[in-house]
From Swiss-Prot:
Residues 1-14 have a biased composition (Polar residues). The chain crosses the membrane at residues 29-49, 74-94, 108-128, 151-171, 217-237, 251-271. It comes from the Bacteria. Belongs to the binding-protein-dependent transport system permease family. This is Arginine transport system permease protein ArgU. It is found in: Cell membrane.
């Protein structure tokens, strides 16, 4: 094998590699020490402050009512996200379709639900029972009282419909990030539209869709605290405040709710990390030596940090 970097001056001795010393950053250590000192001061001050009500905090941290409320919060989060993801995917397809009517309907939906505050929407869903008691179809009348009196269901619908407007843009951006040639190649192989989306487009788009969707899931967990506007108060924040009002101690119960939110959010973040790793299989942002050699051959120049050695054929 021969080195392609050989030239007229190949016989000259190669220079010794530079022994670079890492740059020192004393300012970082000073800043870290200041932050640690301030954090330690705040923690010690808070632990010695009776206004935080640490006895109440310890008494209610694992209370059965709080644990049940945490389960209600998780159920609200998952059901609302499922509704939001499914409806958001449908809206994304409608926006990318060639039908102007479907595009207009999807745009109007996004305009309304992204343009109004989620709290206002939830208040509206809570008042829906006073606006519509029944629906008269002429030949039949549908009673809505039993449906609209289910506050948990209204909370899921309100959160899910709002989330769908944001998921539609996330899904649309992920699909549009896949090169158009992928769709054309799939059609050339005889795949129909649904098979192309399932086997070609979505697996590549998921690498772009998953990170913002994970952020939306975490955001949805915290947004469930707003369903008291419906009103639905059996979730974590509402239940904590009910206990706080009976004890006249809002601070420790707020800390209890915050602790549960932090634990659940941390679990979701770990799940998001491994899910992103799963969909990143087969993709990399670095080039292998063979790819660098091919790039050098295409450009007619060899990168300075790469030595290209031609492959020898294997003997039979």
């Amino acid at each position: 094998m021969s080195d392609l970097n050989q030239g007229p001056g190949a016989s000259t001795a190669q220079p010794k590699p530079i022994e670079a010393k890492p740059l020192r950053h004393p300012g970082r250590w000073v800043a870290a020490a200041i932050i640690v000192a301030l954090l330690a001061w705040f923690i010690i001050s808070a632990l010695n402050n009776e206004a935080y009500g640490w006895d109440t905090y310890r008494s209610y941290l694992f209370d059965t009512r709080i644990a049940t409320a945490a389960l209600h919060t998780i159920a609200l989060t998952l059901l609302s996200m499922i509704l939001g993801v499914v409806l958001g995917a449908i809206l994304a397809v409608m926006r990318m379709s060639g039908n102007p009517v479907m595009q207009g309907v999807a745009w109007l939906y996004l305009w309304i639900f992204r343009g109004t505050p989620i709290y206002v929407q939830l208040v509206f869903w809570g008042l829906l029972g006073s606006l519509y008691q029944s629906i008269n179809l002429g030949f039949a009348e549908i009673d809505l009282q039993s449906l609209l009196s289910n506050m948990f269901l209204l909370a899921v619908i309100g959160l899910g419909l709002n989330e769908a407007a944001y998921m539609a843009e996330i899904v649309r951006s992920g699909i549009q990030a896949v090169p158009e040639g992928q769709m054309e190649a799939s059609k050339a192989l005889g795949m129909n539209w649904s098979m192309t989306m399932r086997r070609t487009i979505l697996p590549q788009a998921m690498r772009i869709i998953i990170p913002p969707t994970g952020n939306e899931l975490i955001s949805m967990l915290k947004t469930t605290s707003l369903v008291v506007a419906i009103p639905y108060s059996l979730e974590l924040y509402g239940r904590s405040m009910d206990i706080a009002y009976s004890l006249f101690e809002p601070v420790p119960m707020l800390l209890v709710a915050a602790s549960w939110y932090l634990v659940i959010t941390s679990i979701l973040m770990v799940g998001q990390y491994y899910l992103e790793k799963h969909f990143e299989k087969g993709s990399t942002r670095t080039l292998t030596a063979r790819q660098l050699a091919a790039l050098a051959d295409a450009e007619g120049a060899i990168p300075g940090n790469v030595t290209v050695v031609p492959e020898t054929s294997k003997e039979n």
